[in-house]
Amino acid sequence: MGRKLLGLLMLAVLLAGCAGVPSSSAPQAIGTVERPAPSNLPKPTPGMDPDVLLREFLKATADPANRHLAARQFLTQSASNAWDDAGSALLIDHVVFVETRAAERVSATMRADILGSLSDMGVFETAEGVLPDPGPIELVKTSGGWRIDRLPNGVFLDWQQFQATYKRNTLYFADPTGKTVVPDPRYVAVPDHDQLATELVSKLIAGPRPEMAHTVRNLLAPPLRLRGPVTRADGGKSGIGRGYGGARIDLEKLSTTDPHSRQLVAAQIIWTLARADIRGPYVINADGAPLDDRFRDGWTTSDVAATDPGVADGAGAGLHALVNGSLVSLDGQHTVVVPGAFGRMGDQTGAALSRNGRQVASVVTLHRGAPDMAASLWIGDLGAEAVQSADGHSLSRPTWSLDDVVWVVVDGNNVLRAIQEPASGQPARLPVDSVAVATRFPGPITDLQLSRDSTRAAMVIGGQVILASVEQTQAGQYALTYPRRLGFGLGNSVVSLSWRTGDDIVVTRTDSSHPVSYVNLDGVNSDAPPHGVQMPVTTVVANPSTAYVAGPQGVLQYSPSADGQQGWSEVPGLTVPGAAPVLPG
């Protein structure tokens, strides 16, 4: 990353309170692959006014190919030689140039709003704030018209052109348990669809973003490499992943020999390509032989369905709810109190089913809101008895990890994991290191929910959505690392949150105009329709198809994929004031 731009980015982060952008240990220009420039990029013309030329230059920086060759056409040779375009870029909008003009030379300063950043790996993160003065930009008149003769190091991307040039794709890496794959969204500028598969597999081999380096496994890590570009399954170079053409991936230097690891190699490749609309069959070879002889003619997504990142946890368990402080299930349009401890206990204020839907973790709160308020965490099989596993003045709504361990926040600041000791069967409370979160975002954690793959934790702190990585240390302990804020547009209005997918979070808010919103891993937020929602809304739970929220009239549901559904509808049987929805997670 250029020193000037790094300094500007750090200053902007301090001013705006936005999250820093991770940079790789060996920065490189964004997208150094040599390929044709997109046809919609501007070029300098002899009659172009200096102000127009500067704006067109910012648009041209959206193409990273060949070390920003498209943008370098706007520079004099000396400026091009001096310009350091390595590292991350700032995405800017509402640009104003303040110019001082002479006959043969123009000096300009740039003012703009910062909307985000794009790392050298293609990681985009939203931000907010005003661009600190990057330094003067100077233009000179040449025989071919005005050209930029001096400019700050680093890359400034025009927001509109960025949206037109880059496309969001998702890489997938294996979770530590090998049960599923974890999303790592990237933005790539590849105008030729036939080059996209090669670009994505190359990025897989290069590895995950820095904040994921200790939370996922990359079965495609070096020395493994591509033997050549990805082709059609029959070796053709056009129509890759289109129709029935499929894709052929030839790898070499694969050290993995056990079948499960090879299955994960395939899963990483297949889900990455399939989610980019590069269709199979996927012929995957390693060192001149099929990755797995069973699939020498090609893999499909069905062959790696066990790791499907889009599968809903415990789908067969169905929707449950807390009604009058007890756990109920739905039988058609009627509720049934569940047997066992969770149906008998009253005063339950937050609950979650385990990922497989067979266990329950629930918080019982006595004297809620009073000085002597007391909360306790209970864990047990659904329909059976429960064991008290933690207590405190207050406890957050529990959340389950992929390995069936319950996480909860005690008294707003102490994150712990509640487990059963293997030898004694007794409950044990293991602290989670959350110093990085508390240092950067001080204040009580009012909600904490683990992602389906359990490599990320989303939290509500001071009405803001804070995302952190879940790292397991060499000693076997856990820590929340790389905390950053998501959804600047949500302000401080967030009440509760839930993971809809591994990349998308649903939140309830105190904003009556937008009571329910979504925010993704990039930090981009959008709003669900407000129709049918009464304020206030509190608990939210979600799966890939449906979001459920607790409101004054009971539990409401919304399915974005449902044809013609423009608002929220009541859940039959749960139109009870104070009812709170419960799902696996």
Swiss-Prot record:
<feature type="lipid moiety-binding region" description="S-diacylglycerol cysteine">
    <location>
        <position position="18"/>
    </location>
</feature>
<dbReference type="InterPro" id="IPR018910">
    <property type="entry name" value="Lipoprotein_LpqB_C"/>
</dbReference>
<protein>
    <recommendedName>
        <fullName>Lipoprotein LpqB</fullName>
    </recommendedName>
</protein>
<keyword id="KW-0732">Signal</keyword>
<dbReference type="InterPro" id="IPR023959">
    <property type="entry name" value="Lipoprotein_LpqB"/>
</dbReference>
<dbReference type="Pfam" id="PF10646">
    <property type="entry name" value="Germane"/>
</dbReference>
<dbReference type="GO" id="GO:0005886">
    <property type="term" value="C:plasma membrane"/>
</dbReference>
<dbReference type="InterPro" id="IPR019606">
    <property type="entry name" value="GerMN"/>
</dbReference>
<feature type="region of interest" description="Disordered">
    <location>
        <begin position="560"/>
        <end position="585"/>
    </location>
</feature>
<keyword id="KW-1003">Cell membrane</keyword>
<keyword id="KW-0449">Lipoprotein</keyword>
<comment type="similarity">
    <text>Belongs to the LpqB lipoprotein family.</text>
</comment>
<keyword id="KW-0564">Palmitate</keyword>
<dbReference type="Pfam" id="PF10647">
    <property type="entry name" value="Gmad1"/>
</dbReference>
<feature type="region of interest" description="Disordered">
    <location>
        <begin position="24"/>
        <end position="48"/>
    </location>
</feature>
<feature type="signal peptide">
    <location>
        <begin position="1"/>
        <end position="17"/>
    </location>
</feature>
<keyword id="KW-0472">Membrane</keyword>
<feature type="lipid moiety-binding region" description="N-palmitoyl cysteine">
    <location>
        <position position="18"/>
    </location>
</feature>
